[in-house]
Amino acid sequence: MKTICFVSMGDLLVTKGGIHRVTSCLMNELEKRGYRCIYLFYPIDESCYYTGNVEDEAHRLSPEQVEDYLTKEKVDVVINQQALFSTLLTKLISGFKLRHFIYISVFHNTPAIYEKTFTFSRLWYNFLHQSGISAKMSNCVRMLVYPLWKRRVVKGAGKMYAVNYDASDKCVMLSSNDWPILGYYLKRDVSEKCVTIHNPLTFDTVETTECLCHKKKNVLIVSRLNNFEKRLDRALKIWKKIEDDGFGEWHLYIVGWGLQENMLHNLAQKLKLKNVHFEGRQPSEPYYRDASLFMMTSAVEGWGLTLTESMQTGVVPIAFDSYPALHDIITDGYDGCIIRDNDLDAYAACIEELMHNREERERIARNGLMSCKRFEIDKIVAQWVKLIENL
C-alpha cells in the first residue's frame, strides 16, 4: 500500500474552490483503490504546515519538521497542488537530506494566468480601494511603469514555474493545450515531464434526462466574486441586455462570495437589474438542479469545474473562449456554447436564443449529460493510478 501526501494551501473545505474539491475527490477515490492518502496544508502566509485537516497547535509543523513527518508517515508520493502559485514546498523538499518519495507538481490553471489577470484595471481598482498610503503608492508606481512591471511579473512567473518543473518527477497539466504555454515560459520542450490528466466530475452522480422536466427559467453563475479573474461585471452587463430585451420571466442567480462582492452589488443597482439574486456562499447543487443555463465569463481558468458540474446536472454551459482547456470540455453547439472572448452582444444573443428555443436548449443539455461522462471519477483516477505506478 502506497502512501500519498497531497499538499495545498488551506484546509480541505470543498466550498473553497476547484482545487479543494478535486483534491477531496481524488483522495477519496484513491483510498477506495487501496492507497493511503494524507493531507498537508499551509496558511496563506506560508509560515508553517498543518497535518490532517485541522489548523491548531497540535497539528502544526514548522517547515523544518516536514521532512521528519513525511519520513515517519512513510510517504511514497507527494503531490503539490499549488505549482502555479508557490515554490515554497519545492524549495523545502529540494533541501531534504534524502528524498525517499516521488514528487508530482500539478498546474491547476493555465500558465498564462498572471499575464491575463495582472491588468492595468486591476491596479487602478486596487489604487482606488486600498486604504494604506504605502499600498496606494505601490500601485501608483506600478501603473506609471505598467509595461515594465507586467514584463517583470511574467518573467517572475516563468522562474517560479521552472523551479517547480525542474524539481518534479512529473508535472500534471489539465489540458494538453497548456503544454506549449508552459514551454514558452520555460523556453524549452516540456514533453519529457508533462502529462495531461483532466479534472474529474465533482458531483457524485450524472443526472438522467428526466431532470430536464424540472428545470426553471433560471440562469446560474457559481463563482468566487473575484472580478479580475471571473469578470462578473461582464455577466451583469450581458444580463442588462437580456432584461432590456424583455426576458423578464428569467432570473439570474449568483452563488459565491469574494472580494468584489460589494462592487458587483453596486453595479447591479447602477444597471437597475431586477432579476439578479446574489446568494452568497451556498451549496451549489440545488441551484444547478433548478437552472437551465449556466454563464461563465472568466478571463482565465485552469479547467472550469463549474462547466462540468453544469453538464452533469443538465444545465447548458455558455463560456467565453478565454482559456485553453475550455475546448477539452465543450464542443461548441453540441454540449455547450463557446462565445468569442469579450463579445458581450454575441453572448447575450446566444442566451436569448436558448431562452426562446426550449427544444434546442434541451438538445444541448442532453448531449452534455452524455459527454461529461468522459470525466467520471473512475476514468480520471485510473490515469492517476497509472502515473503513480509507472514512476
Question: Model segments located where?
Answer:
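A conserved mid-protein helix/loop that constitutes part of the nucleotide-sugar donor-binding site
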Residues: H20-C25, K217, N226-K241, L259-H265, ...
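A short, well-ordered alpha-helix in the C-terminal region of glycosyltransferases
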Residues: A346, E353, E360-R374, A382-K386
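Aromatic "clamp/platform" in nucleotide-sugar-dependent glycosyltransferases that forms part
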Residues: A299
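Short His-centered aromatic/hydrophobic patch
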Residues: N80-S86, F107
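Short hydrophobic beta-strand element within catalytic cores of glycosyltransferases
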Residues: V316-F320
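Conserved acidic donor-binding segment of nucleotide-sugar-dependent glycosyltransferases
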Residues: D321, T331-G333, C337-L344, E353-R358, ...
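Nucleotide-activated donor-binding/catalytic signature segment of Leloir-type glycosyltransferases, i.e.
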Residues: N262-R281
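A short, active-site helix/loop in glycosyltransferases that binds the activated sugar's phosphate group
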Residues: M143, P147-K193
